[in-house]
Amino acid sequence: MPRGGMDDHWPSSDDQGHEPKEPEQLRKLFIGGLSFETTDDSLREHFEQWGKLTDCVVMRDPQTKRSRGFGFVTYSCVEEVDASMSARPHKVDGRVVEPKRAVSREDSARPGAHLTVKKIFVGGIKEDTEEYHLRDYFEGYGKIETIEVMEDRQSGKKRGFAFVTFDDHDTVDKIVVQKYHTINLHNCEVKKALSKQEMQTASAQRGRGGGGSNFMGRGGNYGGGDGGGGGNFGRGGGFGNRGGYGGGGGRGGGYGGGGDGYNGFGGDGGNYGGGPGYGGRGYGGSPGYGNQGGGYGGGGGGGGAGGGGYDGYNEGGNFGGGNYNDFGSYGGQQQSNYGPMKAGNFSGRSTGGSGGSSSGPYGGGYGSGGGGGGGGGGSYGGRRF
C-alpha cells in the first residue's frame, strides 16, 4: 500500500536535520521503460507514494534534452525501496515501467551485472555449512525455490560454493548489492549466477565491435573456452583472464563441475581468479574495464570497443547519448528536482582515451561514449521505448 497520497509531502533528509543512515546506493532505484513524456515531477509524483525521495531524475540527452527513457529515484531508507518494489507493477504516465535496484559502479564492470536473474552464487562457504544454514539465512530476503550445495562427484566432499534460486529477481538484486554476507558464522561472497547462455548475452552486449575477445580483453572470452590453462574460474583463470566461464579450453572444467572449481572456490586459483584483476588484461588494452574508467557500456579507450547495455534499453546510445556513467552522477549541467547534482559525466561522449569519468553519485557507464579509438556502443542495450 502506498504510504501517502499523491499530494502528501515527504520531507527531505535536510528537513529532518540529518542525512539518511543507509548508503545511497542501497536506497536507489533505476527506472527503465519510461514514456518520453515523463518528467522529473511526474516520476516523483508516482514513486513518492511509497516514501520520501531524496532525489528523482529523468535522464536526458545533453544536446536535445529529450528523455533517454530511463531515470533514477532515491528514497530516504531501504524500507521504502522495499515497499516500492513490493508494489510492482508500476505505471507512470500510462506506461508500465521497469524498476530495479541500481547497481554500483564497481559491480557494473562485472559481467552480467545488469542482467535480470533469479539465481545467486554463494562462494566461500565452509565444510560445516549445510543447506539449512543457507535456507535460514536467505529466506529472510524472499521466497526460495531451490538450494544446491555443490559437492565433488567422486568424493562427496563439499566444494565450498552453492546456488540459491528465488522466485523474484528483485530478491537477487537486493542480496547482491550487499556483496558480503555472514552465513553460519562465516563470511561469504554472493554474486548473480549466470547460465552459459546468459553470459553469452552479457558478452554480446558488451563486446560489439573493437578488438579483444568478447569483453575480457585478450584470451578471455568469458564463456568461450578460449585459452590454454585455467578454464572456468579455476586455476590461473579468474573470470576470463584465460579460459572461460564454462568454456572448454585448458585445465579448468566447466560451470560448477569438474576441474578446479567455480570462480576460484574449491580449487587452487585464488579467490575470483588469481590473475591480474577481474578479467585479466582489461577491456580495451589497459588494466581494468574501459581503459581508464569507461563504465558499463562506456567506451574503452586504446582500441577497445564501446558497446554494452543494461538489459537492453535503447540500443546504440539512445539519441546519440553521452557517457552516462553508471550509478553515480548524472552531473554536468543536468538538474534534478533537488537542484544541480554533483559533478559527474553526463555530457556527451568522452574524449582522449578515458571512456568516462568516475565522479559523482551516478558515475559509471549507462551510456555510450568511448574516447581514444574506443567505439561508441550501446546505452542500455537493445530495445527502444
Swiss-Prot record:
Give residue ranges for domain RRM: 27-110, 118-206
Q: Where in the cell is it found?
A: Nucleus
Q: Which GO terms describe its biological process?
A: mRNA splicing, via spliceosome
User: Where are the stretches annotated Disordered?
Assistant: 1-24, 199-218, 331-385
Name the Gene Ontology molecular function terms of this record.
mRNA 3'-UTR binding
Locate the compositionally biased regions of type Gly residues.
207-218, 350-385
Broad class of the protein's primary localization: nucleus
Keywords associated with the record: Nucleus, Repeat, Ribonucleoprotein, RNA-binding
The record, for SUPFAM superfamilies, names: RNA-binding domain, RBD (SSF54928)
One matching Pfam family, short form? Answer: RRM_1
Cellular component, GO, one term: catalytic step 2 spliceosome
Name this polypeptide is given = Heterogeneous nuclear ribonucleoprotein A3 homolog 2
